[in-house]
């Protein structure tokens, strides 16, 4: 029996999720489904330029799992481009919030949501907050603290 899939962490959810060649009717086009974690793998590796280990750490998966995800993603995109198929970005096994922050004023510990990127404490409103993990897990806030 196969193990259940662990949720992969993603930091980006695209606003545009459907791409198709111009001049083809939607009802007559083959569609390839690109899962959100596959898009995230390509974004981290190809756009942010991270190495495999850094990508795997950000997505909270092993290096081998990351490699499997990105291989699948690149194959799907290549197939869509060469066959003239549509790309539908949706679904997957992912989560968007895992990073814990702590307010230095009231001691509140809370999760941030990457989509909202909370920079102030939800309890007292203080902006005197820090990332508990600090190991690249919450890149948005940690990066701002290091500037």
Curated annotation (Swiss-Prot):
A Pfam family reported for this protein in Swiss-Prot or TrEMBL: DUF134
Give the highest taxon in the source lineage.
Answer: Bacteria
Hey, which family's this protein in? Answer: Belongs to the UPF0251 family.
Name by which UniProt lists this protein? UPF0251 protein NT01CX_1491
Q: Which organism is it from?
A: Clostridium novyi (strain NT)
| Organism classification | Bacteria, Bacillati, Bacillota, Clostridia, Eubacteriales
């Amino acid at each position: 029996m196969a193990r259940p899939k662990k949720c992969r962490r993603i930091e980006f959810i695209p606003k545009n999720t459907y791409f198709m060649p111009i001049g083809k009717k939607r009802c007559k086009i083959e569609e390839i489904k690109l899962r959100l974690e596959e898009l995230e793998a390509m974004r981290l590796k190809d756009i942010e330029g991270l190495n495999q280990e850094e990508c795997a750490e950000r997505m909270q998966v092993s290096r081998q799992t990351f490699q499997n995800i990105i291989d699948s993603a690149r194959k799907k995109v290549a197939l869509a481009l060469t066959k003239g198929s549509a790309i539908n970005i949706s679904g997957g096994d992912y989560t968007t919030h895992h990073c814990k922050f702590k307010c230095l004023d009231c001691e509140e510990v809370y999760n941030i949501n990457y989509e909202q990127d909370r920079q102030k404490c939800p309890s007292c409103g203080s902006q005197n907050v820090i990332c508990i993990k600090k190991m690249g897990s919450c890149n948005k806030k940690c990066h701002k603290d290091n500037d």
